[in-house]
Amino acid sequence: SNLGQMLVKICKDDSVPLVNIVRKPEQVELLKSLGAEHVCNTNDPDFMKDLVKALIETGATLGFDATGGGNNGELPGQILSAMEMAANATAKEYSRYGSDTYKQVYIYGGLDRQPTLLKRAFGMSWGLGGWLLTPMIGKIGMERFQQMRERVASEIKTTFASKYVQEISFEEMLQPEIVK
């Protein structure tokens, strides 16, 4: 997705480790061509193993899911479980309640309308919730929001650029035969 491509660029620019999860081999190649280090394909037989390895290497304990399900509704739970496995791989002691590392997945889109399924293999220190831009802006305040807007404006042709198959004018957009 365009958002995934933007995330690769901004995280690389800001030295923030990022783990990307995609569904197709061509998406893996695209993100890697942009400089992504960790790209896991949900359709790969080693998906969970690759995801745990990437999470160990990055230390990531926060995830964002655009689908709200994916992988038959299991993707958010798979992410949490992989985070738990990564936390336990470096844990100093065992607890029957799981690691004490807090893991969070935010669903910010509803591309997959089927139920989100959680197979509880991620201990007791976790969260799953929704994420929307408008409430986040209220929490960070107008000054920080303005800084973010300025960054997007200054990087609109680079970091935040989108690729389109075709551009049409506003007048053309109003013609049903062109929009189809």
What do these predicted ranges mean?
Residues 7, 51, 152:
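Aromatic/hydrophobic pocket-lining residues that form π-stacking "cages" and hydrophobic walls in ligand
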Residues 25, 46, 112, 132-137:
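Residue-level detector of flexible, active-site-proximal loop/helix-junction positions
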Residues 22-26, 42-46, 67-70, 168-172:
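Short beta->alpha linker loops
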Residues 1-45:
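Mid-domain Rossmann-like dinucleotide-binding core that forms the NAD(H)/NADP(H) cofactor-binding site
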Residues 34, 38-129:
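Glycine-rich cofactor phosphate-binding loops and adjacent beta1-alpha1 units
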Residues 30, 126-139:
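A short, hydrophobic/aromatic-rich structural module that often spans a beta strand
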Residues 11, 31, 63, 79, ...:
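Terminal peptide-recognition signature
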Residues 80, 86-91, 133-180:
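C-terminal hydrophobic helical "lid"/dimerization subdomain
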